[in-house]
A protein has these predicted regions:
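NUDIX/MutT-family hydrolases
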Residues: 110-142, 159-163
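Active-site-adjacent beta-strand/loop module that shapes the phosphate/pyrophosphate-binding cleft
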Residues: 88-108, 137-140, 145
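N-terminal amphipathic/basic-hydrophobic helices that include classical n-h-c signal peptides
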Residues: 1-14
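Short, solvent-exposed loop/turn elements at beta->coil junctions and helix N-caps
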Residues: 14, 83-89
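Conserved Nudix-box catalytic region and its N-terminal flanking loop in Nudix hydrolases
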Residues: 34-70, 156-163
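Conserved hydrophobic/aromatic beta-strand scaffold that supports enzyme active sites
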Residues: 28, 37, 97-101, 119
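Conserved N-terminal beta-strand and adjoining loop/helix that marks the start
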Residues: 12-35
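A short coil-to-beta-strand element that immediately follows conserved catalytic motifs
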Residues: 76-84
């Protein structure tokens, strides 16, 4: 491992180009035509979505998604692949979600206090209640030509930008 000097932050008076960022991960785990989804029960974001969680300070993104999948699903995933980024503004910063895919795993599926885990056939997606941005999220994850899902905010209006 090679050490690099840390760049000094600009002072408040010197127009800092840094911002506070909250880092999280989501992972699409597939088994053939099935995907593992979490039916979230928390009031802030209900419906079926991908499992995930926060990146701990000093933790690599790959280590974070492996740890979160173990905690949220009970599965040990191998070789997760980074396939995109979702981001949106939050008070005093930005919320960044690194989007991963995994097809290699071992273990037995468990649920957590975040919600019930369930294998869902891809042809059943239209029959279940997914979180509001699930279709756009899946579009970015599954289309190799896309890498970014961003919410743009103008006053009270939130617009989705996909690139």
């Amino acid at each position: 491992m090679r050490n690099f000097p840390l760049r000094k932050r600009r002072s408040e008076n010197n127009m800092s180009r840094t911002e506070n960022v909250e880092l999280t991960v989501l992972c699409l785990i597939t088994d053939g035509d099935r995907m593992l989804l979490q039916n979230r029960i928390k009031n802030d974001w209900q419906g079926y979505t991908l499992p995930g969680g926060h990146v701990e300070p000093g933790e690599s993104f790959v280590d974070a998604v492996i740890r979160e999948m173990k905690e949220e699903t009970g599965l040990d995933i191998m070789n997760p692949r980074l396939v995109g980024v979702k981001q949106f503004p939050i008070k005093d910063g930005r919320y960044v979600v690194l989007l991963f895919k995994a097809i290699e795993f071992s273990g037995t599926v468990i649920s957590s206090d975040e919600g019930q885990m369930e294998w869902v056939e891809s042809n059943r997606l239209s029959e279940i209640n997914t979180v509001g941005d699930f279709k756009d999220l899946m579009r970015v994850i599954n289309d190799p030509a896309l890498t970014e899902f961003q919410y743009l905010v103008d006053g009270d209006t939130w617009t989705v930008s996909i690139k």
